[in-house]
């Protein structure tokens, strides 16, 4: 059995943003837990794994220790450190100010020495130095936050400077790749450098494309970026996983169709890329060739509204999709041809936003 930890939104989200009249999300108490049979695809809920965590939007596991990190989407932003016990049970060890507003993403370097946190509110990028038990020794700014806080609607990104939506460490541990929806850019900084390091690269995107998430091809020569604002999958030339320039753009939905891409995830075999499409209520399925070039193959209905979380299971047999506005998680079986086909019934989970596989 595989423990699936689900980052969700909590009620305090609506202290910072105007809640639309049409919103149907249910607030969680923190991090939810599911149990997945990765052989059959059977999924069952197992309640709250950790409460009192403020809108843990994205989760990251330590590479060598049973420790989970959660980016707390609040003002000020925080990073929560949780011990992972038997059966996926979580015990919160600490919640530390992450030196920015609205912590939106967290990632841990391959050596397990540093957790990096990106902030949506003010564009701050911070480094949390870890001890031998995975605890946070000190938090240091990498790039201080300079932008004005967000107000009003959640998607009002423009006009006030950097707003980071994701940070990824390159697989070799050498670079920090950040997706900046506020400046329509993807910037790579050297990992382990001091404050305000000179970027290794900066790739500009079309205005209001809102580059949201980054994924790496295993060859190290290609990276993928999904634009939330223009529903486009960008294919980038990369050098040792560092994105350097756009080489192709693939519209994910037909012209005239509204979609807000969310998360993208490359299958472990490197041959299929999955992208969640909010408002279109579908998952885009793209074929990937040996060189990393992609081709849009089609769409599979997400069996719910506004798929925000998309993640392939550790075995590569199943795709989990979190439908935010339906408050459900759906399992899809991934066939030999790479196409996801729905299994079973949707499982109720309040406002699912991200997945982490704890075992």
Which residues fall in each region the model found?
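Short, conserved, GDST-rich strand-edge loop motifs in beta-rich repeat architectures
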Residues: 2-26
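Short loop/turn segments immediately following the C-termini of beta-strands
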Residues: 9-11, 73-75, 120, 130, ...
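Beta-rich, blade/repeat-based domains predominating
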Residues: 15, 52-64, 99-111, 146-172, ...
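Short loop/turn segments immediately following beta-strands, especially the blade-tip
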Residues: 34-41, 81-89, 127-138, 189-196, ...
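A short beta-strand motif characteristic of beta-propeller blades
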Residues: 44-51, 91-97, 140, 151-157, ...
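Blade-loop segments of beta-propeller domains
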Residues: 44-112
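Blade-level signature of beta-propeller repeat domains, shared across WD40, Kelch, NHL, RCC1
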Residues: 324-328, 341-359
């Amino acid at each position: 059995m595989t423990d699936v930890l689900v980052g969700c939104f909590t009620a305090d989200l609506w202290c910072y943003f105007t809640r639309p009249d049409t919103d149907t999300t249910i607030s969680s108490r923190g991090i939810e837990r599911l149990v997945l049979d990765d052989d059959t695809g059977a999924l069952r809920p197992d309640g709250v794994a950790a409460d009192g965590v403020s809108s843990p939007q994205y989760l990251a596991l330590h590479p060598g220790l049973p420790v989970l990190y959660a980016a707390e989407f609040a003002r000020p932003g925080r990073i929560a450190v949780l011990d992972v016990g038997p059966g996926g049970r979580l015990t919160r060890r600490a919640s530390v100010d992450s030196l920015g507003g609205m912590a939106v993403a967290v990632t841990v370097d391959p050596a397990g020495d540093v957790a990096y946190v990106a902030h949506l509110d003010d564009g701050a990028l911070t480094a949390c130095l870890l001890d031998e038990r995975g605890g946070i020794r000190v938090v240091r700014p990498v790039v201080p936050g300079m932008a004005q806080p967000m107000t009003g609607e959640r998607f009002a990104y423009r006009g006030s400077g950097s707003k980071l939506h994701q940070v990824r460490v390159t697989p070799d541990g050498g670079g920090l790749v950040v997706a900046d929806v506020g400046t329509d850019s993807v910037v790579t900084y050297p990992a382990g450098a001091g404050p305000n390091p000179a970027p290794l690269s900066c790739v500009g995107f079309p205005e209001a494309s809102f580059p949201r998430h980054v994924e790496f091809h295993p060859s190290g020569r290609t990276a993928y970026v999904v634009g939330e604002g223009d529903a486009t999958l960008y294919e980038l030339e990369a050098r040792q996983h560092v994105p350097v320039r756009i080489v192709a753009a693939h519209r994910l939905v037909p012209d005239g169709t509204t979609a807000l891409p969310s998360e993208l995830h490359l299958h472990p075999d490197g041959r299929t890329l999955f992208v969640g499409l909010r408002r279109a209520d579908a998952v885009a399925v793209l074929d990937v060739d040996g060189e990393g070039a992609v081709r849009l193959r089609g769409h599979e209905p997400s069996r719910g509204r506004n798929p925000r979380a998309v993640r392939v299971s550790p075995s590569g047999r199943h795709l989990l999709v979190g439908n935010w506005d339906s408050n459900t998680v759906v399992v899809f079986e991934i066939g030999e041809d790479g196409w996801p086909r729905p299994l079973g019934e949707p499982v109720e989970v309040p406002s699912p936003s991200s997945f982490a596989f704890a075992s």
